Regions:
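Charged, low-complexity intrinsically disordered regions
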Residues: 1-2
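Conserved pre-motif I regulatory segment
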Residues: 6-46
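Hydrophobic residues on the short alpha-helix immediately C-terminal to a glycine-rich phosphate/catalytic loop
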Residues: 35, 56-64, 81, 153, ...
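Walker A/P-loop
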Residues: 38-64, 69
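Conserved phosphate-coupling serine/threonine residues in phosphotransfer and NTP-handling enzymes
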Residues: 49-51, 116, 166-168
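Conserved helix-turn-beta segment of the N-terminal RecA-like "Helicase ATP-binding" lobe
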Residues: 76-100
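Conserved helix/coil segment N-terminal to the catalytic DExD/H
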Residues: 100-136, 147-152
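Post-DEXD/H (motif II) to motif III coupling segment of the RecA-like Helicase ATP-binding lobe
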Residues: 135-136, 143-185
Length: 185
C-alpha cells in the first residue's frame, strides 16, 4: 500500500554459526524448511519423542542466525540441549551462556543463552537486558511449561522468532489453546 510504512519493533541480533551434521531424513528437512520460511515468526514444532526436535532446533538456529534464548523447565534439559548444540553446530561452549539457579554470573552476550524458566522469570533485570538483543526464543517441552511463566518471559522480550518444541501439542489441564496463543500454531 502506497504511503504505508511497515514498522517492525522485534529484536534482531545476528550471529555467525554453522551446522555440522545434515538432517537424517525427509521429515526433518521438511519441518526445518517450513519453520525457517515462516513469515509470521512463531510456531510450534510438534514431533514424536526421538524424532530429533533438538537437532531441528539447532539446525534452525544456524539458519536464522539470530542470538537465541532457549527456555527449559529443568537443569537436566538445559544440559541436554547444550550438548545437542555443541554436537550439531560449530557453536562452542564459550559461546553459550547459562542462566539457572546455581549460576552466580550471567554473560548475556553469548550466541546462545540457555535458561531455566523458573530462574529467568525471577531475574527481571536480566530479562530487561535480554529484551533488546534476543532475536530467537525456543521454548523446549512447551506443552508442560507454565503458561503464566511463559507469558511473563515473552512479554518482556521482543524476539523476531519464537519456536515451541513439543512431543505432544496437548496439555493435561486442557489449556492447549494458551500455548498456541503464545507460541503459535
Amino acid at each position: 500500500i502506497q504511503g504505508v510504512e511497515k514498522i517492525d519493533n522485534r529484536a534482531s541480533y545476528k550471529i555467525k554459526c554453522n551446522l555440522r551434521i545434515l538432517p537424517r531424513d525427509d521429515e526433518q528437512i521438511k519441518a526445518i524448511s517450513v519453520i525457517t520460511n515462516f513469515d509470521f515468526g512463531y510456531g510450534i514444532l510438534s514431533s514424536p519423542p526421538g524424532s530429533g526436535k533438538t537437532y531441528m532446533a539447532s539446525n534452525i538456529i544456524t539458519r536464522l542466525k539470530e542470538r537465541t534464548l532457549v527456555l527449559v523447565d529443568q537443569d537436566l534439559l538445559l544440559e541436554q540441549f547444550m550438548e545437542s548444540i555443541l554436537e550439531f553446530t560449530d557453536i562452542t561452549r564459550e559461546e553459550i551462556g547459562i542462566i539457572k539457579s546455581q549460576t552466580l554470573e550471567y554473560d548475556l552476550d553469548k550466541k546462545v543463552i540457555l535458561a531455566t524458566m523458573q530462574t529467568l522469570v525471577k531475574k527481571k533485570d536480566i530479562l530487561e537486558k535480554l529484551s533488546t538483543n534476543i532475536g530467537f526464543v525456543i521454548q523446549d517441552e512447551c506443552q508442560i511449561a507454565s503458561c503464566e511463566t511463559i507469558r511473563e518471559i515473552l512479554k518482556e522480550l521482543r524476539p523476531k522468532y519464537i519456536l515451541g518444541l513439543s512431543g505432544t501439542p496437548y496439555r493435561d489441564d486442557g489449556f492447549d489453546f494458551l500455548i498456541r496463543e503464545m507460541l503459535g500454531p
